[in-house]
Every structure is written in structure tokens, then in C-alpha cells.
Amino acid sequence: MAGHDVQYGKHRTRRSFSRIKEVLGLPNLIEIQTDSFKEFLDTGLKEVFEDVLPISNFTDTMELEFVGYELKEPKYTLEEARIHDASYSAPIFVTFRLINKETGEIKTQEVFFGDFPIMTEMGTFIINGGERIIVSQLVRSPGVYFNDKVDKNGKVGYGSTVIPNRGAWLELETDSKDIAYTRIDRTRKIPFTTLVRALGFSGDDEIVDIFGDSELVRNTIEKDIHKNPADSRTDEALKEIYERLRPGEPKTADSSRSLLVARFFDPRRYDLAAVGRYKLNKKLNIKTRLLGQTIAENLVDPETGEILVEAGTEMTRDVIDSIAEHLDGDLNKFVYTPNDYAVVTEPVVLQKFKVVAPNDPDRVVTIVGNANPDDKVRALTTADILAEMSYFLNLAEGIGKVDDIDHLGNRRIRAVGELLANQFRIGLARMERNVRERMSVQDNEALTPQQIINIRPVTAAVKEFFGSSQLSQFMDQHNPLSELSHKRRLSALGPGGLTRDRAGYEVRDVHYTHYGRMCPIETPEGPNIGLINNLSTYGRLNKYGFIQTPYRKVDRATGKVTNEVVWLTADEEDEYIVAQANSKLNEDGTFAEEIVMGRHQGVNQEYPSHLVDFVDVSPKQVVAVATACIPFLENDDSNRALMGANMQRQAVPLIDPKAPFVGTGMEYQAAHDSGAAVIAKHDGKVVYSDADKVEVRREDGSLDVYTIQKFRRSNSGTAYNQRTLVKVGDIVEKGDFIADGPSMEGGEMALGQNPIVAYMTWEGYNFEDAVIMSERLVKDDVYTSVHLEEFESETRDTKLGPEEITRELPNVSEEALKNLDEMGIIRIGAEVKEGDILVGKVTPKGEKDLSAEERLLHAIFGDKSREVRDTSLRVPHGGDGVVRDVKIFTRANGDELQSGVNMLVRVYIAQKRKIKVGDKMAGRHGNKGVVSRIVPVEDMPYLPDGTPVDIMLNPLGVPSRMNIGQVMELHLGMAARNLGIYIATPVFDGASSEDLWDTVREAGMDSDAKTILYDGRTGEPFDNRVSVGVMYMIKLHHMVDDKLHARSVGPYSLVTQQPLGGKAQFGGQRFGEMEVWALEAYGASNILQEILTYKSDDVNGRLKAYEAITKGKPIPKPGVPESFRVLVKELQSLGLDMRVLDEDDYEVELRDLDEGEDDDVMHVDDLEKARVQQAKEAAELEKAKEEALDKTE
């Protein structure tokens, strides 16, 4: 037997064909959300408060300090928040200290700071009753970036940018004359030496001393001449910079100094963030810059005077490692003191080294480092600016390298915690201005923190973020996999990110650093391709927001691949050679082959095994969760795999789902971590179990109660239904399944079913990817799903009186009210059809003012005679089903309702949808198709043992699409069915073709895995043997019931008077310009005239035509279409005198616009009137007939 058995949870064993021993299990798949939010509550929120506070008033006599904060218990439980359309949030209380510096008085007070939304255990937020997700954002990391560009003459120029988290950009660039310029915050450029002089190093010799002598420095100094001898060089430079930043304002050196300090050196205005400081120090670090250079001076220990490295030595990694302590210490550190006019006058510490120029051995180049400022220094320092300039000048000498902005070492993830912190900071900054003004205006003695703090800007910022940010999204809840994928999504769009239109190919493309961090396959098709990605299975974030992936460390001394796991970011990985997970190993853990396949900085090639530093942890670390659920992924073309991964997320939960016979072993973990199942929180023993709740007695005696959700409506309108898996007496451990969620079976994800599939054509019905299906799948409810739709009706106070929910509806038959209760609300369990009343409601009609007598009669006899309009909630087009639940909310019951609303009724209708012609089906390999025919079971082809086939697919759908995985799955699935086993074939480490054929033989199938099929209609065998097997097929969310639409009478657009478009508006089918050409080509003039007049926008014509049809008279000639009148009005609005004349030169009167209703859509009232009139006439006719009959009798 090929393969070995693996246990997944307590309910499923699979035969796995994996060969690679995985030393690291999958991490929790939603930790990117939960960990980030936890960190925000633990430290992030505190940091935001400490950033903005303390706040002083303008005279610095009062100060408001932050002490701490506390989150109290949430107001609603999760379930209550869902039912009441509320947010699941906890009140946050912040303690402030107000210090009066004149009197020394201190007031401490706790202030309510609004309700803060809390993340659920599933990694989601409940906002206004809807489950939402904050998508993590992929943005360019703060730091310093160097780039090169070739001009039209083929000359290479260099550029550099310091990008902060917030604050002004500082750019350097060269021009065609080899002069270096700087720009501050995208303004006009100035020679870079001007900025150096402003920083307090004004002499030309000083500048050459810092940066070394080079052509670029010399050319720039020549360009930067001393224009005004009355000013010092530093003052002149400061004025020049001020002129660029504030053109047209009077320039003084002092105002320029304070402006530059505010722009770059004030931590409140300029923030690199921890990650920016880390990236800056890393890039400007002397160690990386010296690597591979030849040192041009002796390096001497400043304390002992010992020569550490002699001049002429090449600085290899070993040499640098040997003097690493000294490089981090005081080796070659120089202190420069800026002059007294400088922007910042503190002494500047720089590290300077002289190396031989790579392109000219006779020249010496100076490398300047920033002496690694502390991580807590979040603003720029003078040393940072000088070191950046040095790196930039070194690039022209061939030292250092330019950056790739698409490298994942330069792109980082802003997860939910950071996005919330940024939003909170914006709110606090708005509040700060407010607080400062109140502190200055009001009487100091009586002030308390509560009085000067207005929390509205903060709560508004948070509310706005959750309600309307591009990154706050309604959770995709089609099935557990789509939930999980949504939580792991990474978007490059959103505030501070890219826009679809500006994103080019490079940003969207797969980069070698995506390996193990972002999935190269799962991304949407369409305009967002490559901008929205998914985290790989093992990816996680480090403290700076860079994605890390795990590798097994290779012990270079012994050559053994150890079980020690090291997590590396993309730029750390660039220094190593990494071998693939499937490299063959000996028993002792050493490489079995001298040469192994490996990667180094994007180069995939063979490397000697003794050079390898790390080995992949698992073959599936490359791909995302959805992609890892595709068996035989390695045999599919990547474009089809992309569709396969995306379509699994659109699977509809079925009534009785089945886990796949051929899985990848990922199904268990995906179901477990998705948040849709009920998972045991502690060890214990089941003491009670039914369909609605499970009770587990813990070892310490306490009781855990788990509620099971039954048929709740999910965000996407499908039934969210959980099924209990445990019985009384079962022992459960922490992490075990207590109940399956939707699309789960036995603790595994089960998106579809395992039908018997044949690759064969049948009467041409599976042309163009269509799917032929057996009626068995309809009768046995194999692909039946339940869909829940929510309808609501509310009663409001109108100017004419309150609306009412009632059974007493005007002009409605008793038959139509038969399912309503005494209040006028539909009963639960009623079967309703399109147009049935769900909630009877009447609205007062203001026709005339009542006289005193009528008012008296109303007071005595009740409101029966009052004029009311029937505004009942009815079942919309295509919404028929069974009433599943009714919820009533009133103020009397203590429910919170919007102002003006007195009562709210919600009705849930369940629809059972069987599969039908027009529904979309798909496999897991991007093989999608639409059901074209449902064939009676007796007519389907059958196997030699009499089993009829369930589905027939077109064999022509396979070769050109190159998704051969489906054929391998088909054969292995048949073998699994015959053997009665489940199979796991993990991606890139699954069943080989030998394993496949061994299993086929073991199952007793023919050696080619094909079979003879018999025609169900004739009983004759087909000419050729056919591939028949079991393939996992899913039903997708694109169902024909949601798309089917027909209109007879409906709403018209107000201006053009043409029917509206689209199913939602109950619109018509557009007969466009090209369709008109087609009818013109046929010469079908009468049909054309009808289409362009009665059926479209000839208002009077359509009314008369309706009347004529109902009375059986000939249809009159059409009039002028409304669109023609619109055209006339448009021409008149241009000042042209347009009139329409008939053939006798009489002017034709056109209808005026204000005859329609005062509404965007002109409804069908005219037709209604015509119908009522006709009904009256018919009734009178009947009456007359009856009377005539009476007389004759």
C-alpha cells in the first residue's frame, strides 16, 4: 500500500502520500488579526496617548497628562449586538491628571472616552449588527531609498528619498551636469551643499572633509556660490531654503531655522516610527556598506592603539564579524561641531572610513555612517542627513546599491492594530487643539479634565474608520474558507496606499521575496490583480510589520539540517542560501546529494550542499490557505489554479455537505481556524448535548456552555447552520470540534460533494464547458442549499399622523390576509409567494382637512373612516419561500430605534434552492461551467455494474487549459471510493504518478483507469473507453434564481420616461443602438417602431395602446417619444429656437415636464388608473348583463 494513515481531529483518518516530515505545525491562521488587536489594546493605545499628551496651554501655566486607561465590560453580548443592529463595543475610561503649574494643584479624574469596538474571538468586529473585517494594508515602509535612472543620453543619474511615517520628504538627485541637488517636501531643488551649510558646516573645506573629495562634491560647490557677503554662508543658505519652502514671504534666517526644525527635527511633526528608524539605521550602517570594499587606512582601536585591520585589506564578512564590536563601538568616530548659526547646534557624531574606489584604484572614497542613533530617536538627526548624502555620493563611485521598492523588505503590513492606532491618533490630534483653546480661555481655578476634554473628535474618527474606510469591509461569509481568506487578505489599496489607476505592472507582479510570505497564486482577476494578495500559510508579522517565513537551520559545522526553526524577513533572507523542502536527506539529517536546488536573492539554481544555510519548513509554505486546498496543484497551470482558489471561496454551503475523498490535509486546519465551527475552550466531559447547546464539565468542576447557531442568516444570505458533533459522555480536549459549522463535515471543510463524473460528450449539451447533470442530484438534494433573506418594515411618525401595523388594510381581500396574525404580521412557517403581504401597514393620506363634525365622529367611532394608504411590506420578485423567523422591536420593549421610528419588524424568509439549469458549478482546478441539462437517471450513461454517472464534463475543457490535476483527482477519487478511504495529497508533496497507479490497481480498477460506459437510453456500450471517476464539485454563489428576471409593467425614469434597467429596479431589457441596426437591416419597421415608442418612452402612446389592447380595439398610431422632447429642450437650453412642425406645417405641442410625478421615478399610476377604470367598466357590463338576464327570465 502506498502512503500512510494520518489522523485529522477525532472524526477523520486520511491516507496521506506526503514524504516530507514537517517539523513545524501551521500557526493559528487568524493570528494576523487577533495578535495585532491584542497588541493594540496592550501597548498601542497607550503609545498613542503618550504621543499626543501632555498638552499645555499657550501660556504654559496648565498641563494635561495621561495616566492610564481601562476597558469596561461590553454593553451587549455578541448575539444581542447582532439582533439589535448595535456594535459589539466596550466603554473605555481614561484617567487624566490636570496640573496647574502656578498653584501646584493637581486634579486627577477618570473620563469616559466613548465606546470602542472590540474584536471577537474570530477576528471580526460587529458594527451596527453587521460582521466586518479590517483588511491588513501593504504599504511602502518608512526609511531611506536610493534609486538610479538613465537619462535620454544614456547617462546614469542617482536619486535618494527619506520617507517618514509622517512628515516632509527629503530628496537628493543628480542632473546631467553632475551636480547634486536636494528637494525638501517636493519643492524646487537647491544644491545639496546649501542644506549642509544650513546644518552648520559652511566652509567648502569642511564639506570636502566630511564627504571626501569627488567630482560630484566639487561641481556642486562650484554651483553654490556666496552671493551676499553681508550674510554668513549658513544664514544665506537658510534664507535660500526658506525662499523655496515659503515663496513670496519675507525671508529671515531665524524663521528658516524654526521652519527646518519643525519640518525634520521635531518629533511631534516628523515621525520615522520604530520601523523607519530601524530601516534607516540598517541602510546607513557602516557594516553593510564596508562589505566587499578594500580599506584604504589602518583601523586602530581607539582605546589600546592596536591595529585591528591593515590598509589594503578586503573587508569580507569574516573580517567585519571579527571587528563587529569595535564597529558598533567608537571605532573611527568623529565629533563635528556645527557653527552657531546652524539649525541644530548640538555636536554631530559620525563614523568615517576611507576605502579604495572600486572603479579607480588610485582614488580614496570616504564612507560616512550615522553612528546608529538609538531606536527611540524618531525624528531625523543631522548625522542621518549627512550619512544619507554620503551614501548617495558613494553610489556614483560604485559603492552601495540601489533599492527595489517591490522587495518585501521595503513593503510592510499595517495590520488592524496599527490602522486603529493611526485613526485614534488623528482623533486625539483634533481633540488636542480643542483642549488647548479651552485651557487658555476658561478660568484656571475651577477647571477639571472632564470640562476641557471633548471626546467627539475621537469617537467620530473611530466611527468613520469602521463605518466607511476602504479597509473596513463587510465580511465575505459565503463559507468558512472565504471568511478565513478575508481575514488573511493583504491590500495595497486604501488610504496611504496605491490606487488602481496608478499601479503599474511592477507592483502587481510576483516578486521573489513573496516566497513563503505572500501567495503567488491567490489574487483577484480584474483591475485589482496583484494589488490584493493573501498571506501564505506559514507567514506571520514581526514587530515592525514585515512578513516573516520559517526555515529549518542547517548546522554548517556538521552539515545537518536541524529541527531548529528560524523566522526570516525578506531582507534577512537575502544574505543566505535556502534549499527546497523536498531536498533528500539521509537518516542523520545530512543532505543526501552533493548538489541541491536552492535560492539566493531570487536566483533559483543548483548549489553545493555545504553552502546551504537554511531549508524550507514545508512545501506548502509558498501558497495561501485556499490554494493549499487544491490537490495536485503542481499539475495545474497557474492561471487555472488562481481561478480554482478564488472559486472555492464562492462555494455555497449545502444542506448535507461531504468532505472531499481526495483532499490535501489542509481541510481540517482551515475549518478549525475559520471561526465558523464551535471549538472547545478547555478540556472536559460532555454532560449535555442537543441541537441548540452543548455543556462541558471542566476538570475543575466549572461548566462551559456552548451555543449552537441554527439557520442564522450570514452576510451573504446563506444559512449559517452549525451541527453538534459530540454526545453526552464524550471526553473533549481543548481545541476539539464541538460542532461543525456551515460547509463542514466531521471537523473538515466540505464545500461540495463527491459525484461520479465522466469525461464525455453527450448530444452536444456540454459544449463550451457546460455541465450535464443527473436528476438524482436534484431529487436526493445533493446540491440543495438554503438561503435566508431579511426584509424589514418600520412605522414612522409622519406629518399627517403615525403609520400603523395592522390587519385592517384598505381594498385587500380576506384571502390575502389569511397568513397574518391579529397584529397584521405574517406567521412563522407560512409559505409565501411573490406579492404576498408580510407586514400589513397603513400610512395616513393627507387628502383634506377634517371638519369639526368629522373629527367628533372619528373620536366616537374610531379611525375606521380615516383616509389611509396601504404601504404593506410584500414579498419582492423572486423572494418566495417559508417564513423562518419574525423579530419585532418596539420602544416599549426597551429596544433602541432610530428617531422617528416607533416599531420595526424583521421577517426572515428561507428558500430551499435545488440545483437547476443555469446554476454555476466548478471543480477545484478552475474547471467551471454552467448546468445545461438535467437528464433523468435512466437516460444517463451507466457503469458495467449498473451505477449511473452523476455528471458529464466535456473532455475538450482539459488540454488547452492545462489543468491536468482534475484528471489525476478523478482517478484517485474513484480508487478512494472503491476502497472506502479518504486521501490526503498535500500540495507539492502529494501522490506521484506511481502512487496514483498503485492505488488504482489496489482498488481493482483497470490499468488505464478508464471503463466501458453503456448508453442509458439504448443499453448499447459507447464506442470508446471513458475516464470515469469521483471529482469534488462545488456549487457556486452565481445562481440563476438571482439572475432570472422578467418585466411586464414597471417603473419609468422621470426625465427620459424610458424603463429603468436592472433586476433590482425591476427594469426592462435595453434595446440599444446596435440592436436597432440589426432590425433596420431586416427592414422590420413596425417592430422597430413599437420598440422605440410604445415599449419605451412614448408616454401617451403607451397609455392608449394599453387601453386599446384591454378593450380589444386596434392600436392607435404612436406619438412623439419623450427622448425627442428631451433633445428639443436641450437644444432650446443652448439658445436655439426649436419647434416641431407636422406635415401641414402646424406646430406640434410637446408634453411639459412637470406633468409627471415629483419623484425620480414616474410610477405606473396612469396604467393603474386605466386598469381600475377598465375593471369598473367590466363590472358595469356584467351588472347590465345580469339585469338583462333577470328581465328575460
From Swiss-Prot:
SUPFAM superfamilies: beta and beta-prime subunits of DNA dependent RNA-polymerase
Catalysed reactions listed for this entry: RNA(n) + a ribonucleoside 5'-triphosphate = RNA(n+1) + diphosphate
Any Pfam family the entry gives: RNA_pol_Rpb2_2
Enzyme nomenclature, EC number: 2.7.7.6
InterPro entries documented for this protein: DNA-dir_RNA_pol_bsu_ext_1_sf (IPR042107), DNA-dir_RNA_pol_bsu_external_1 (IPR019462), DNA-dir_RNA_pol_su2 (IPR015712), DNA-dir_RNAP_su2_dom (IPR007120), DNA-dir_RNAP_su2_hyb_sf (IPR037033), RNA_pol_bsu_bac (IPR010243), RNA_pol_bsu_CS (IPR007121), RNA_pol_bsu_protrusion (IPR007644)
GO cellular component: DNA-directed RNA polymerase complex
Protein family (similarity comment): Belongs to the RNA polymerase beta chain family.
Keyword Coiled coil found: no
Function: DNA-dependent RNA polymerase catalyzes the transcription of DNA into RNA using the four ribonucleoside triphosphates as substrates.
Region ranges (Disordered): 1173-1193
GO MF: DNA binding; DNA-directed RNA polymerase activity; ribonucleoside binding
Name of the molecule in the record: DNA-directed RNA polymerase subunit beta
Single GO biological process annotation from the record: DNA-templated transcription
Subunit comment: The RNAP catalytic core consists of 2 alpha, 1 beta, 1 beta' and 1 omega subunit. When a sigma factor is associated with the core the holoenzyme is formed, which can initiate transcription.
Annotated keywords: DNA-directed RNA polymerase, Nucleotidyltransferase, Transcription, Transferase
Biased composition (Basic and acidic residues): 1177-1193
Domain of life of the source: Bacteria
Record's keyword annotation contains Cytoplasm: no
